[in-house]
Structure formats: C-alpha cells, structure tokens
Regions:
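Beta-strand-rich binding/interaction modules
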Residues: 81-122, 129-133
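Extracellular and select intracellular beta-sandwich modules with Ser/Thr-enriched
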Residues: 51, 114-117, 131, 165-170
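Short strand-edge motifs at loop-to-beta-strand transitions and within beta-strands
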Residues: 13-17, 127-135
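Short glycine/proline/serine/threonine-rich loop/turn segments at secondary-structure transition edges
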Residues: 23-28, 97, 137-152
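Short beta-strand edge segments in extracellular beta-sheet folds
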Residues: 58, 120-123, 172-176
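Accessory beta-strand-rich segments of carbohydrate-active enzymes
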Residues: 1-67, 93-94, 109
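Active-site-adjacent substrate/metal-binding segments within catalytic domains
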Residues: 1, 6-9, 16-18, 62-73, ...
Length: 208
C-alpha cells in the first residue's frame, strides 16, 4: 500500500516480517516485494536475480508457533526403540500473557497415529517460550538411503481460557542415527554409506 515495511540484505536466507499494521481491512491491498542487486554485485559473474523460493502470507492468533519453530531430534534409536525430542517455539505477540497446553501427535508414513504427548506452557506478553517433550517410539521404521521412511508430527496450541486450538503446525522427519569418524566414514544406523553428489546451485549450474 505504498508504505515501506522492512529491508533484508541477504537473499540466501529466509526472512519474516509483520505487515498487519500496514493493511487496509476495508479495501483491497497491494503487497510489493522488490529485489534490487544492481548496486551490490553478489557474484564474480552475471547471475540471475529474483525470488527463487516460495513466499507465504501467514495469518493467525497473536499466540502461535513461531515460523520454522517446530523441530524433531532423534536422541537415540535402534530397531526396538527411538527416543525423540520434539521442540516447539511459541511466540506471543499480544499485550497479555497466555497459557495453555501443546498437543503433539506423531503419525507414521501411512497416516496412522503412533504416539502423542501434551505439555503445558505459560508465555509472557510479547514473549517467547520453548516447549520440549520426549517421546519414546517402539519398533520405529528407520530412515536410510534405500528405505527413506518418514514420520510427521502435528502440534496444536490450545488456549487455556477457550480450550480451543489457536494455531497448528506440522513437520516431517526421519528417524536415524548418524555417525562420522575417520575409520568408518559416514554411517547411517550403523551401516557405512558412501557420499555421492555434486554442488549444483539453482542458478548457473556448477558455477552457481
């Protein structure tokens, strides 16, 4: 709508900015993202410029999972048991404190629910809090190069006052144990794996 919002100087990492204060809620809005690199060359050769990745408009409650704020870490795993840590970073951009609980649900590749946990939280106004939960998963389908089994975890943020979900987030993950040393090289779930690949960028191929 003609108002300057924010400048971001490095194009190879994501950025996130609030635009609600610049919106007109009773009329059409115009959102313009300008890419300007002519005054600051970024390569030793001529390369293309523009937006190469997805751009999203996020809407929701003042209390929400922060962008890219849901992560799963495999603490330990074998064919009998996987020990996972799910970390959800909650952000409260409102002017009052909030509390409630986070509901975590793990699904396997077929969509079947295989585990779940709940964890309470309290977050100050204009604050952040990280909720961590350990989840034990029996008989996991491990991820490897030949059978890249995947799971997903759904995160619901439940407000204490209304008992309603004010935000949801989901991420996909694989369960595997990585080891790297000078004797065996890279091992995935105890099996040696040879690294094969190339550095091919999105622009200018091998020179990108």
């Amino acid at each position: 709508n003609g108002a300057f919002v924010q400048k971001f100087r490095y194009g190879y990492t994501p950025c996130c900015m609030r635009i609600d204060r610049y919106l007109r809620y009773d009329a059409p809005n115009t959102l313009q993202v300008a890419i300007r690199g002519t005054n600051l060359p970024n390569s030793r050769w001529y390369s293309g410029q523009g937006i190469y990745r997805d751009a999203w408009i996020l809407t929701g409650d003042y209390l929400h999972v922060a962008p890219d704020g849901l992560h799963v870490t495999t603490l330990d795993c074998d064919r009998e048991l996987a020990v996972l840590e799910v970390k959800a970073e909650l952000q409260n951009e409102g002017q009052r404190s909030r509390e409630g609980y986070v509901k975590l649900t793990v699904h396997d590749g077929s969509g079947r629910e295989v585990a779940g946990r709940k964890a309470r939280f309290y977050v100050d106004s204009n604050g952040r809090v990280t909720v961590r939960q350990r989840i034990d998963l029996e008989k996991p389908a491990l991820w490897n190069v030949d059978t890249p089994n995947l799971y997903s975890v759904d995160c619901q943020v439940i407000d204490r006052e209304t008992e309603q979900a004010v935000d949801t987030a989901q991420t996909t993950f694989g369960i595997r144990k990585l080891q790297l040393d000078s004797v065996h090289g890279l091992r995935i779930n105890g099996q040696s794996v040879k690294l094969k690949g190339g550095c091919v960028h999105h622009d200018n191929g091998l020179l990108g």
